[in-house]
Amino acid sequence: MGARSSQTVDPVLSRRYSSESETVLVVRRRPPMVNGGGFVVSNSKQVVVFRVDGCGVLGTKGKLLLRNGDGNDLLLIRKMGGIVQALNMVHNKWEGFGYDNEGTERLVFTLKDPKDSCLVQNSSIKILVHGKPPKISSTRNNYVEIKGSFAERACNIMDSDGKAIAKVRIEKEMEEMVGNKKDLYHVIVKPNVDQSFIVGLIAILDYIHGESTIC
């Protein structure tokens, strides 16, 4: 019997959204004038497994909501504001909140992105994963990092050991078919990685780059 693939990142939201095999997700942007923007994520069977709503649906800037295919809320993402954030000249701060069994919000990750748009294109973005439950005695594997260009649909999400746990790509045939690489692209998720967490990070990248979730 073959060895099972090692899990590089503990489930951030739920083990339910991971797979023992590599998974290719298809991201399709929704027209802002029809559906309020955002995007939907389908699996290889063309079944919608995630939906992301942004400003056009929620009516609030700096707020994103990830739902599963059944429409249940999975992850609420907020761009932090206030005086302290305004005084930070280097980074914007984002926080992702999952929900416990009683529907109470719990902080699951924190992301900081450069305020300088040039740095967004050329530097990595680090995410602190708070875990479920939060890890106290060890910080190992509590970080993931995004490297590459999301705008060009050529970026990797890496674990703390530098191994890719997900990739954003667009096939040449797909680009020729849709004409705009931003409208339809692939997210390739490695085995035993929480796909809902990965899609949550994609939602923030989409917003940072002024795409379907912004208004």
Curated annotation (Swiss-Prot):
Domain of life: Eukaryota
Keyword Transmembrane listed: no
SUPFAM superfamilies, A to Z: Tubby C-terminal domain-like (SSF54518)
Pfam families cross-referenced by the UniProt entry: LOR
Family: Belongs to the LOR family.
Function comment: Might be related to the phospholipid scramblase and tubby-like superfamily of membrane tethered transcription factors.
Identification of the protein by name: Protein LURP-one-related 16
